[in-house]
C-alpha cells in the first residue's frame, strides 16, 4: 500500500480485497455479517490513507515549514527537513517501545507522537484541522489507556485494551506507508531541474501539496452539489457571488535583495463558489457540457427549482448508469476481457468503438 501511493492512488482499491482475504483466512467460519464488518474496516483504512496520510504529511510538514521560515527566519526547507527527521525518529522510538513492551505510558505517548506527526488526525486546513487533530489524538490516547480484564486458566489479570502487538503492527504499517510516500521525493528532485513538463513546479512542501491534490485538474461535486443549470448564489450585498473560503495557497516570496530572509506568502485561497440549486449525487454538473448531457439522454425533461430547470434525480441516475458506468467503465473493461468491436473512435454510436459483447 505504501509503494502504491507513489505509483497510482487507484492501487488503494486493493485494500478491501486484501482485508477480505485476511478475514476469510483468519476466520474459516466467516459469515455475511463478518464480511460486511471487514469491508467497513477496509473503507476506513482507505479513507485514512487517502484523506489522512496523503494530505496529512503535507499539512503537518507545512506547519513546520511556516514556523521555521516565516517565524524564526530560517532558510527554505529547514522546517521540512526537521519534520522528516522527527517523523522518522518518532516511529523508531514508538516501534522500539511497543516491541520491548515495557512501560505502557511510554508506549502510548510514543504512539500518539508518531500518529500525530504522520498527519492522519489533522483533517482539513488551518485552525480547524489543528483542533480536530487534537481532539482525535486525545480520544486515541484515552482508548490506549483503557484496560480490560483477562481470565486465562483461572488467573485473573488486567491488561491494556490495545495490546503492544497491535500498536506495533499499526506503527509498522504506517512506516511502510511513509517509505512508499518517500518515492515522491523524486518529483521534487525532478522539479528542481526545471524540466519542460513541470506541473505545479513542486519544489517545496506547499507546491508538492498542490501536485498531490491534483489542483491543476480542478474538482467536481461528488455526493452533493450543483447541476449544470444551477445558478450561483448572490452575496448579501447583492453585488458579488457567494463563496465558501478554502485553504490558503503559499508561495515563496521573491527577494528584493540578497539580505532579505526567506519567507512564504499567501497568494490566494481555494475558494469555491456556492450555488442556489443543489442536488444529491450530481453527475451532470458542468455547465460547459450542458448540450452533451442533454444529447446523451435524448433530452432532459427536468423540473422547476426556484425558476431554474434542474434535471430530475431519475435523469441524473440514468446518465450515471448509461454513460459513466456503461460507456466509460464497462466498455473499457470489456475491451480487455472480450475484445474491441473496432478501432473507430466512438461517441455513443452502436457501431463504433464498443466491446464485442457490449449492450
Roles of regions detected by a PLM:
Residues 10-22, 55-59, 129-137:
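Transmembrane-embedded, aromatic-rich helix segments that form part
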Residues 357-359:
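Conserved small/polar residues in nucleotide/adenosyl-binding loops
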Residues 28-40, 72-82, 100-111, 126-131, ...:
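Membrane-interfacial entry segments at the cytosolic side of transmembrane helices
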Residues 44-65, 94-98, 118-123, 175-199:
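Membrane-lumen/periplasm interface segments of specific transmembrane helices
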Residues 20-29, 92-101, 142-151:
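Structural signal for the C-terminal ends of transmembrane alpha-helices
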Residues 1-6, 115-124:
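Membrane-interface alpha helices of multi-pass inner-membrane proteins
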Residues 1-18, 24-29, 167, 287, ...:
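Membrane-integral, polyisoprenol-dependent glycosyltransferases
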Residues 168, 172-342:
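Aromatic-rich transmembrane-lumenal/periplasmic boundary elements in polytopic membrane proteins
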